[in-house]
Amino acid sequence: MKLFAGNSNRVLAESVAQYLNIPLGKASVRRFADQEIFVEIQENVRGEDVFVLQSTSYPANDHLMELLIMIDAFRRSSARRITAVLPYFGYARQDRKPGPRTPISAKLVANLITEAGASRVLTLDLHAGQIQGFFDIPTDNLYAVPVIARDVKANYATGNCMVVSPDVGGVVRARSLAKRIDAQLAIVDKRRERPGESEVMNVIGDVSGKDCLLFDDIVDSGGTLCNAAEALLNKGANSVTAYITHGVLSGGAVARIASSKLKELVITDSIQPTNAINDAPNIRVLSISDLIGEAIARTAAEESVSSLFD
């Protein structure tokens, strides 16, 4: 077994390698003057079980192209099996046609990874479960819930916690956390009462006096989270903390979170945190390196991965 990494999340890759007690593989990923990407594998991988870790986060197209070229390099170097380890799968929110004459980009990206030569995929908290079926190769979708539940139990009196889904579509995900910490579930329902009016946040469930835990897979602009936190506090919640797997946090999101009524935003390192995120007073990062490392170890040993979540 050998583990390699592109440039998107070297810190996580090094932590995973440490968990596995193996060195991170030697590979050069660099750019020519015209910004074309060039990859050189700097050690023998013939007959090896290769894992290449790369989040296709911002800049998504550069990191995706790095991944595809690395997979091709391993295939042409006679690796026995190539597993693409994608802690964050970019383009996941483009999983359906939003209107006529539009693409399903998540399916296209899955095809590209497969055609480049990947034998299987390991990823984390896909935005939509059906994306797992977009790949024509074995694909394991890991869940951050065990890591998050452990952190909740260490920091909160779970008897007073209420898990909240920030929208109707995330209820199944939120319920999985609520079940693990034995908490009740509430939902924030966004709707426009009349055309042309601003969105209204309706809270389904009694959150009065509760420590509310918003749980979702992606935070991007942060607007929905901040508005949901305000709605919950207006309904009498004691505090609001957000647990989110993938901290995209684009644009002015970090500043928006810092000035919001959220007690804390907790994200994982599926996307490498920026300096601004690390310096933010109310943003904390949980590592998923042990989870990813254990999934890799079990895959290499041909053992069950799903039993990690039993």
Swiss-Prot record:
<dbReference type="GO" id="GO:0005737">
    <property type="term" value="C:cytoplasm"/>
</dbReference>
<dbReference type="GO" id="GO:0016301">
    <property type="term" value="F:kinase activity"/>
</dbReference>
<feature type="binding site">
    <location>
        <begin position="34"/>
        <end position="36"/>
    </location>
    <ligand>
        <name>ATP</name>
    </ligand>
</feature>
<feature type="binding site">
    <location>
        <position position="127"/>
    </location>
    <ligand>
        <name>Mg(2+) 1</name>
    </ligand>
</feature>
<keyword id="KW-0460">Magnesium</keyword>
<dbReference type="GO" id="GO:0000287">
    <property type="term" value="F:magnesium ion binding"/>
</dbReference>
<dbReference type="InterPro" id="IPR000842">
    <property type="entry name" value="PRib_PP_synth_CS"/>
</dbReference>
<dbReference type="InterPro" id="IPR005946">
    <property type="entry name" value="Rib-P_diPkinase"/>
</dbReference>
<feature type="binding site">
    <location>
        <begin position="220"/>
        <end position="224"/>
    </location>
    <ligand>
        <name>D-ribose 5-phosphate</name>
    </ligand>
</feature>
<feature type="active site">
    <location>
        <position position="190"/>
    </location>
</feature>
<keyword id="KW-0067">ATP-binding</keyword>
<dbReference type="GO" id="GO:0006164">
    <property type="term" value="P:purine nucleotide biosynthetic process"/>
</dbReference>
<feature type="binding site">
    <location>
        <begin position="93"/>
        <end position="94"/>
    </location>
    <ligand>
        <name>ATP</name>
    </ligand>
</feature>
<dbReference type="Pfam" id="PF14572">
    <property type="entry name" value="Pribosyl_synth"/>
</dbReference>
<dbReference type="InterPro" id="IPR000836">
    <property type="entry name" value="PRibTrfase_dom"/>
</dbReference>
<keyword id="KW-0547">Nucleotide-binding</keyword>
<keyword id="KW-0545">Nucleotide biosynthesis</keyword>
<feature type="binding site">
    <location>
        <position position="167"/>
    </location>
    <ligand>
        <name>Mg(2+) 2</name>
    </ligand>
</feature>
<feature type="binding site">
    <location>
        <position position="216"/>
    </location>
    <ligand>
        <name>D-ribose 5-phosphate</name>
    </ligand>
</feature>
<dbReference type="GO" id="GO:0006015">
    <property type="term" value="P:5-phosphoribose 1-diphosphate biosynthetic process"/>
</dbReference>
<feature type="binding site">
    <location>
        <position position="192"/>
    </location>
    <ligand>
        <name>D-ribose 5-phosphate</name>
    </ligand>
</feature>
<dbReference type="GO" id="GO:0005524">
    <property type="term" value="F:ATP binding"/>
</dbReference>
<dbReference type="InterPro" id="IPR029099">
    <property type="entry name" value="Pribosyltran_N"/>
</dbReference>
<dbReference type="GO" id="GO:0004749">
    <property type="term" value="F:ribose phosphate diphosphokinase activity"/>
</dbReference>
<keyword id="KW-0808">Transferase</keyword>
<keyword id="KW-0418">Kinase</keyword>
<comment type="function">
    <text>Involved in the biosynthesis of the central metabolite phospho-alpha-D-ribosyl-1-pyrophosphate (PRPP) via the transfer of pyrophosphoryl group from ATP to 1-hydroxyl of ribose-5-phosphate (Rib-5-P).</text>
</comment>
<keyword id="KW-0479">Metal-binding</keyword>
<protein>
    <recommendedName>
        <fullName>Ribose-phosphate pyrophosphokinase</fullName>
        <ecNumber>2.7.6.1</ecNumber>
    </recommendedName>
</protein>
<keyword id="KW-0963">Cytoplasm</keyword>
<dbReference type="InterPro" id="IPR037515">
    <property type="entry name" value="Rib-P_diPkinase_bac"/>
</dbReference>
<dbReference type="InterPro" id="IPR029057">
    <property type="entry name" value="PRTase-like"/>
</dbReference>
<comment type="subunit">
    <text>Homohexamer.</text>
</comment>
<dbReference type="GO" id="GO:0009156">
    <property type="term" value="P:ribonucleoside monophosphate biosynthetic process"/>
</dbReference>
<dbReference type="GO" id="GO:0002189">
    <property type="term" value="C:ribose phosphate diphosphokinase complex"/>
</dbReference>
<comment type="similarity">
    <text>Belongs to the ribose-phosphate pyrophosphokinase family. Class I subfamily.</text>
</comment>
<comment type="pathway">
    <text>Metabolic intermediate biosynthesis; 5-phospho-alpha-D-ribose 1-diphosphate biosynthesis; 5-phospho-alpha-D-ribose 1-diphosphate from D-ribose 5-phosphate (route I): step 1/1.</text>
</comment>
<dbReference type="Pfam" id="PF13793">
    <property type="entry name" value="Pribosyltran_N"/>
</dbReference>
